[in-house]
Curated annotation (Swiss-Prot):
Its EC number is 3.6.5.-. GO terms for biological process: ribosome biogenesis. InterPro entries: G_OBG, GTP-bd, GTP-bd_Obg/CgtA, GTP1-OBG_CS, GTP1_OBG_dom, GTP1_OBG_dom_sf, OBG_GTPase, P-loop_NTPase. This is GTPase Obg. Disulfide bonds: none annotated. It comes from Methylobacillus flagellatus (strain ATCC 51484 / DSM 6875 / VKM B-1610 / KT). The keyword Ligase does not apply. The gene is obg. Monomer. GO terms for molecular function: GTP binding; GTPase activity; magnesium ion binding.
Amino acid sequence: MKFIDEATIKVYAGDGGNGVATFRREKYEAMGGPNGGDGGRGGSIYMIADRNINTLVDYRYTRVFRAQRGENGRGSDQYGASGEDMVLRVPVGTVVSDKATGQVLTDLAEHGQKVMVAKGGKGGLGNIHFKSSVNRAPRQCTKGDPGEEFELYLELKVLADVGLLGMPNAGKSTFIRSVSAAKPKVADYPFTTLHPNLGVVRVDANRSFVIADVPGLIEGAAEGAGLGHQFLRHLSRTRLLLHLVDLAPFDESVDPVREALAITEELRKYDEALYNKPRWLVLNKVDMLEDSEQKVAEFVQRLGWQGRYFAISALAGIGCRELTYAIMEHVEEASRVEHEAAENTGAASMSGD
């Protein structure tokens, strides 16, 4: 299925029903006291995160959503029925923003998380509310309030443990194919990956992590060139970034060190927090090099890289097993630290109460 990661929709909550002005009519009393009921509340619109949905494709085809209007009030003190609420299901990881202001309204990061995005209007008042000692037969009633309406921007951030960075054709899709059951399109030309690919990497029966391959970056991606900038957002939730570098480019005039520096600079310009995430260097296609160990050492020295690095061949499977086990250990440790921090925060807030 094509991965749709953004959509713009309009939501219209239901208007409140109108109140009415009616009077009791009895056999010996042509016009008794007021008995006009209130209008019903308009239906509200909610969004709920659903792990069974993995794209925003439905919101590309249906863009306008209207909740039900509240019923008008009736005589005999009868209130109008409330409009039915509308629930829109979206993938876990969907960020909802007000299109007009850009303000983030909610981040639906957990399955079952539910939030109101447009509130239904209040019902109008019937004339029963306007009876007083000086006005025993009020003809006043009020209309229902309009429901809220918004144009919303939906943005899906892939929920992955590991994100892959790299120039087009660095071998990211091949790497995902090599270590997971995902089958992204692979070919020897840039921009093969046009949408984010997710792969589940299972190191044994009970341990796995999710890896995201996003479209290749080129210089200028942070300003919008190429395909990269609109997908960099998918890396924001990852626990680890892998920077894949093609050590054996088909075009011999290409300098892998220069390309690696360009990617690093794009990342820094796009988002400082993303730049500061844990990042490992993965040097790909070592099977195509003579004296690969020396070439790897020279590359690391020229780049001035101080962090962790791995030399692999995604196509031949060289070094992939060691890399995936190292990733698994990192993801598990990061998860443990996050849980401990969350527990400590919760305990601190409870003691503060």
